[in-house]
Amino acid sequence: MGNRNLKWPASVAVLSAVALAACTTAPGPETRAAPPQPEMPAKVRPSEIIGRWGYAAYHKPEDRARTEANARGQCKQPFVIGQGPNGGVMMYLADSNQLQELRLKGTPGGRDYIGPAGETPGVQDREIVSFDGRVLVMKYVDPEVDGRYGTGVFVRCAPRA
């Protein structure tokens, strides 16, 4: 009977020590996410694309010329790219009916994108495939979205008379 009485206090002491040790362990080293890289400026400036545009889209590269002609015909009901309050441009993201300010962003490889602030290219961005001041061609970075919307052709509309 004497041995059983000694085991109980010893068991309580061991369990208490283990529980106390678990409470006093030092936390591991804190890992912090790297700060986001600053956005590179795009070669295309927001002021160059603000205005009234005819818009059409294509899925097959051989349809580009026809699509450009169709876009020119859409100037009766233009797609308006406005100036954003913070220096960006006001446009719609895919699947959104809300205008929002988007940024023109560059990359070290020389490609330009239009999209929300953040990673470049981001999943919501559009790549500026070409721009000559009169015709702006853009495609969505996300392949699924690009498959639905196609490559967009914007043709600058003549100034209002």
Name each model-derived stretch:
Residues 27-39, 110-161:
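Beta-sheet ligand-binding and adhesion/scaffold domains
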Residues 13, 74, 147-150:
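Short, solvent-exposed coil/turn segments
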